[in-house]
C-alpha cells in the first residue's frame, strides 16, 4: 500500500508523483512560467521553492541535492547561475500562481505558475501608534495656520501662540485617538 502524501494525489503511485513533480519543476525553471492544472501547481510550489532555496545556498552539497531531483544538468546550471542571483534578496515566495480559467474538454481549473524574478521592494515598517497619531496630528496642525491668517495679531503674540498650539493639538489628537480606540473596543 502506498504511503499517503500531503495534499491531493496526482494519480499513479508515489514514484510517478515524484517524477511528475520533478518534470514540472524542470519545465518551470527552464521556461520561467508554465501553464498547468491548479492541483499540480499547488503541489509543485513547495518543491520549486525548496529547490530555489538550495540554489540560493549555492554550495556543492546543495547542487547535488537538486541534481537528485532534477536530472537535467543544464536546467540545474541555469537555476544556480541565473535564477538564484535574481531571488537572492527575497526570503521565500519565489513562485506566483495566477488563475486562468477552466480547460476546454474536462473543465479542469487551469493556472499559470511562474517564478517571481522582480527585485524585492522593502516595505516601510512603522508602529501602529505612530501611524494613528500622525494623520490626527497633521490635520489640526494644518488648520492652525489658517486660523492665524484670518485674525491679524502682532508678530510677538503670534510666535507665542504657535509655541503653545502644537503641544495642545498633539495632546488633543492623542486624546481623540485614545477615545476612538476605547469606543471601538466597547463595540
Curated annotation (Swiss-Prot):
For region Disordered, the annotated ranges are 122-187
One function term, GO molecular function aspect: structural constituent of ribosome
Q: Tell me which InterPro entries the record gives.
A: Ribosomal_bL17, Ribosomal_bL17_CS, Ribosomal_bL17_sf
Q: What biological-process GO terms show up in the record?
A: translation
Ranges of Low complexity composition bias in the record: 127-144
Give any Pfam family that matches: Ribosomal_L17
Q: May I have one GO cellular component term?
A: cytosolic large ribosomal subunit
Regions crossing the membrane: none
Gene3D superfamilies xref list: Ribosomal protein L17
GTP-binding listed as a keyword: no
The UniProt keywords, alphabetically, are: Ribonucleoprotein, Ribosomal protein
Q: Where is the composition biased (Acidic residues)?
A: 145-157, 165-180
Q: How does it assemble?
A: Part of the 50S ribosomal subunit. Contacts protein L32.
- UniProt record similarity statement: Belongs to the bacterial ribosomal protein bL17 family.
Protein name per its UniProtKB record: Large ribosomal subunit protein bL17
Species the sequence originates in: Clavibacter michiganensis subsp. michiganensis (strain NCPPB 382)
Whichever gene encodes this chain, its name is rplQ
Amino acid at each position: 500500500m502506498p504511503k499517503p502524501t500531503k495534499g491531493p494525489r496526482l494519480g499513479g503511485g508515489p514514484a510517478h508523483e515524484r517524477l511528475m513533480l520533478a518534470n514540472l519543476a524542470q519545465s518551470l525553471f527552464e521556461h520561467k512560467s508554465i501553464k498547468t492544472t491548479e492541483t499540480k501547481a499547488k503541489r509543485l510550489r513547495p518543491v520549486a521553492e525548496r529547490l530555489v532555496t538550495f540554489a540560493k545556498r549555492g554550495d556543492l552539497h546543495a547542487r547535488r541535492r537538486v541534481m537528485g531531483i532534477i536530472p537535467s544538468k543544464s536546467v540545474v546550471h541555469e537555476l544556480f547561475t541565473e535564477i538564484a542571483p535574481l531571488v537572492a534578496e527575497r526570503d521565500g515566495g519565489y513562485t506566483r500562481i495566477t488563475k486562468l480559467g477552466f480547460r476546454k474538454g474536462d473543465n479542469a481549473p487551469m493556472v499559470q505558475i511562474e517564478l517571481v524574478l522582480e527585485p524585492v521592494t522593502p516595505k516601510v515598517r512603522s508602529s501602529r501608534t505612530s501611524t494613528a497619531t500622525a494623520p490626527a496630528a497633521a490635520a489640526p496642525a494644518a488648520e492652525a495656520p489658517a486660523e492665524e491668517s484670518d485674525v491679524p495679531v502682532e508678530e510677538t503674540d503670534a510666535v507665542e501662540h504657535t509655541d503653545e498650539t502644537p503641544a495642545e493639538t498633539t495632546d488633543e489628537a492623542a486624546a481623540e485617538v485614545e477615545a476612538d480606540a476605547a469606543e471601538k473596543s466597547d463595540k
